[in-house]
Design a protein with these regions (language model features):
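Position-specific recognition of the canonical hydrophobic site in helix A of tetratricopeptide repeat
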Residues: 5, 12, 39, 45-46, ...
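Structural signature of tandem alpha-helical TPR/SEL1-like repeats
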Residues: 13-23, 47-60, 82-94, 116-121
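Conserved structural position within tetratricopeptide repeats
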Residues: 26-29, 59-63, 96-97
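Alpha-helical segment of the N-proximal tetratricopeptide repeat
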Residues: 2-30
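TPR/TPR-like (Sel1-like) alpha-helical repeat modules
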Residues: 77-114
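Helix-start (N-cap) detector for alpha-helical repeat units in TPR-like alpha-solenoids
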Residues: 1-2, 35-36, 69-70, 103-104
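Canonical tetratricopeptide repeat
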Residues: 6, 40, 47, 74, ...
């Protein structure tokens, strides 16, 4: 399984997203309870602009592992793209609760609040 994740990650680094999705899907089919395979595929869906599929996979990650702070941070990114700013802020707050020393939630929450201000002007 680790070999599949490594292969998929290499494909992502080469921007071969469709092939990476296939590899991560294979890992999911082999072990549908392995949260990290779902999270990797969610990341590739995000990178390829398929935010709805990314969110669906993130939901599965959090169903399997509710404290997966990486998935919560990814959920924040997805919700920014979907302009669901309040949901994005909540995702980052949850990530920060789980991993208090994580720096990105504070940075992203500040940026989201700026986006909200810009839209109300």
């Amino acid at each position: 399984m680790t070999l599949l994740l490594n292969k998929g990650s290499s494909l992502v680094n080469e921007s071969k997203y469709n092939q990476a999705i296939d590899i991560f899907s294979k890992a999911i089919n082999l072990d549908p309870l392995w949260a990290e395979a779902w999270n990797k595929r969610a990341t590739v869906f995000y990178l390829s602009g398929n935010f709805e599929k990314s969110q669906k996979d993130i939901d599965k990650v959090l169903e399997l592992e509710k404290r997966h702070f990486g998935a919560l941070a990814g959920q924040g990114l997805v919700n920014i793209q979907l302009k669901n700013y309040d949901k994005a802020i909540n995702s980052y707050k949850r990530a920060k609760e789980i991993y208090p020393s994580m720096k990105s939630p504070d940075i992203m929450i500040k940026q989201i609040k700026e986006l909200i201000k810009e839209q109300t002007i």
